Amino acid sequence: LDEMSWDEVEAKRISNEEEIAEQMGWKYYLPEAAQTKEVRQQLDEIQKQSEYKDVRDIKVIDPCMGSGHILVYAFDVLMKMYENDGYSQRDAAQCILEHNLFGLDIDERAAQLAYFAVMMKARQYDRRIFSRGIQPHVYAIAESNGIDSFTRDYFANNDPKLRAALDSIINDLHDAKEYGSILTVAPADFAALY
């Protein structure tokens, strides 16, 4: 920062963060996600399935997204799939944010980093993505401490299976911020909520 002010950086319109890091003398470290091959294989498998009709139907969820590496990688893979289906990059970026990518993390800061990473990836393909009001589906998991039985009953809507699923996740996420990564959340079917 001593050698270059932020105004000078902006004036040069350096758009590549690696270039900025290099010019500022910073260490730029963003390791590749170890799961990239697995993500690619799973998406290829989905695409080959006979029931695959529309790339918008593919859902990629990272339940422990951290800073969003897997989501960013999946974004690029999905972009190629959209392009193969005839979408423009701009339309594909919007569709990916709206229909395909979902991420959760217990850490609010990690969720913010993932939001930033996914939006920067979307901006790579659509320079006006911020003005479109599209928000990625990346969220910090909230504790269930404040959820009372009336709220649960409202969402369960007299469905005993849904009530049991809600009870399970409410119990599992009690004091979630305290327990963090040692939480174990039992699988549950929440399809009735939609």
Each model region followed by its residue ranges:
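SAM-dependent methyltransferase catalytic region
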Residues: 1-194
